[in-house]
């Protein structure tokens, strides 16, 4: 493939996935992070180098932007930042993917101003992390882009991502998302994490 994904240099897919993206014949184009985040301006410059170049055959085509929420450094994107990044994605016809392995903790943070509905409206793919948010295993992927929905299950099958007992995975999320249990669990964890942070701060650590 000649397509690539734009991500922060600290992005999980760039550092902790044993070159899984590259193993599918795609390239990761990294951008220097600031506290784990990248900006719409940076993404615009990176994508523009291809889409506005007279000789694009010499480059990979940026087709997706990868964000983590929260980031690998525990920081959060604001709604304003997410909207700005969405605008750049629309400008160049790129997909926006949000890694939600710790989504619940980000949503429950006091300073957060992004809702699940915002993610659904502004991203092409995001997911509810389960493994790190109270489930035994697995993640619940939400695909909002009709382009990406087509044949997605076939791609899962081709890449060994279909579980024979997959309903057990779904049952976890059925329970976690019922009556907002998922958000209760993660918000409680946020409160406790802030207590630990405050204790360190009092000790000057």
Report residues per predicted region.
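Conserved PLP-enzyme active-site core in the AAT-like
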Residues: 1-205
């Amino acid at each position: 493939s000649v397509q690539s994904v734009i991500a922060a240099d600290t992005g999980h897919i760039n550092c902790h996935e044993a070159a899984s993206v590259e193993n599918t014949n795609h390239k990761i184009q990294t951008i220097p992070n600031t506290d784990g985040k990248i900006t719409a301006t940076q993404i615009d410059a990176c994508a523009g180098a291809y889409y506005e170049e007279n000789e694009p055959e010499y480059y990979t085509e940026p087709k997706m932007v990868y964000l983590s929420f929260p980031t690998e450094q525990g920081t959060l994107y604001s709604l304003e930042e997410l909207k700005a990044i969405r605008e750049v994605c629309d400008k160049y016809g790129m997909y926006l993917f949000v890694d939600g392995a710790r989504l619940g903790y980000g949503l429950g943070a006091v300073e957060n101003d992004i809702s699940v509905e915002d993610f659904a409206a502004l991203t092409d793919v995001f997911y509810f992390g389960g493994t790190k948010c109270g489930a035994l295993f697995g993640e619940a992927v939400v695909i909002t882009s009709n382009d990406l929905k087509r044949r997605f299950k076939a791609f899962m099958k081709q890449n060994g991502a279909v579980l024979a007992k997959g309903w057990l995975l779904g049952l976890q999320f059925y329970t976690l998302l019922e009556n907002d249990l998922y958000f209760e669990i993660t918000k409680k964890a946020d409160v406790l994490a802030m207590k630990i942070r405050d204790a360190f701060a009092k000790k000057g650590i």
